[in-house]
């Protein structure tokens, strides 16, 4: 399915996203003229491939390929064992869509419940492994070509991590990640030993530091183009599997980055509705993209909702494509591509 935004729709008033039913047709919604700069004249939304793409999308330009982690599934059914997930690679062909199933392959890496991922400065994948009851939660580095896995960090102060969820690499090489206790709540991790924190890891010194502890369930995170601001989603409204508590956090928090290693006091940036935010990214203009149950919501630098890529089931997304102007979106059942007129902030993929 593909939709091109026609000029006639740009001047029409559009209802807010929570007015749309869950089965709303994929497309674009303009709430503010600023979103027209994001869309350009030829924006379109296309199905790339039907597959179990869940989290961690990473585009590698040198391969023209998208890596992602799969929906966790228990072998033989929920009653037969702990859930498992793997890293998959989707070989692309520019914008020749949709992709064929033959272009999907599994990365031969021994990873345990992988979730969020990003591209390291050395071209390897930096992976959030949530762990299991018998395998530790950790941040690892994976060579997708060989499947070789290297542990970067698997504990704080001698205590086990919860279930690392999402990760970003700053230009100085430091690794920032969230560590909510979803693994315990979903039954595949032991009882937590630490809080639901946001961490900064310095591979050079091996030092792991807590940089934020004021979250219910810290989830996605992304830096502004100048890396002076860190945005973190809090999906505390989804505290238990399948639950939604409207009185719990479902918002994006912004922090000033101090001395490249500390965070100032958090401030509310935006509240997402319907649902709760998971994935988050920032474009070259400083606009913030956050997931909601209705799709990808796009906010101005001031925190105003300016538009939406309507795609129910959205989990996470990343900028990529040969020119960097494609937002690849995972929905648990498919990978979609939104062709836009902007690129990601400080895009280093590939």
Segments the model singles out, each with a brief description of its role:
Residues 1-350:
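Sequence-structural signature of mature extracellular/luminal beta-sheet repeat domains
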